[in-house]
Amino acid sequence: WVHENKVSIESQLDEYGAILFSDLPVENAEDFDLFVSAFKYDTFTYEESLSNAVRINKTDKVFTANEAPSEIEIFLHHEMAQTPMYPKNIFFFCKSASQYGGETPLCRSDYLYAELLKEDASLIAKFEKNGVIYNSIMSNGDELVSGQGRSWQKTLGVSSKEEVELKLKELGYTWNWLEGDNLSVTTRTLKAIKELRNGNKSFFNQVLAASLGWKKNSNNETSPVRFGNGEEICNSNLQMISSLAESLTLLRNWKDKDILLIDNHRVMHGRKPFSGEKNREVLVSLTA
């Protein structure tokens, strides 16, 4: 079915940025792996990424969505835009929808860029000129109570402090060791705006997720995200970006067996808190 419809699927993905598949005969991680494999895209493996969200692998290509506790909201973001390496497409599979909440909000970042340009062209110019830098706290061992709880050992694929410092130096990152061998890491400057294949631009970053949901470094109150020149992004601008993004956000309840394909270069996603007796289980596969 995918082979017969791939051209149409990709055409619609180019136009809309996301496609929802419903009622396909996909029941589990293995079926989902076969569905994703049918597209014949290059796999973007989670083990080799620099993401610091806790995930659990189900197959070589399939893993759980962020394992953060159900009461935590994961704010709008582009997958792994806080790192130099990020996937092109994201496949989500809802194996089991939650009883209440748990939606995956979607926001077109090319639309957001256009709205921000109209609202404050000088702010967009600062993002384009300076880019952004991110500061995150990596724990010594997985921290399951956080949306960014993957340990520095797993995030960077190392086992010792000497190895992690060498890896961070190669990446052009800076770092400070904290109490308990936790690690404060600051990225090199990364782009905040992405030029798309059609010539349009998207607000491609993790500014909202970092500013609204990440922990500050309690040692020096370093903000999780700043302009690349070190300047703080003022709260009024963050609130304006958040408000515009919310006005462009689509929210739909998951149904069991739904599959969602999104273009990670153009569409941000998140996760709403959830509750109820039915356990939410959403699986993910990334492609390059």
Name these PLM-found stretches.
Residues K40-N52, K278-A288:
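C-terminal end-helix/capping segment
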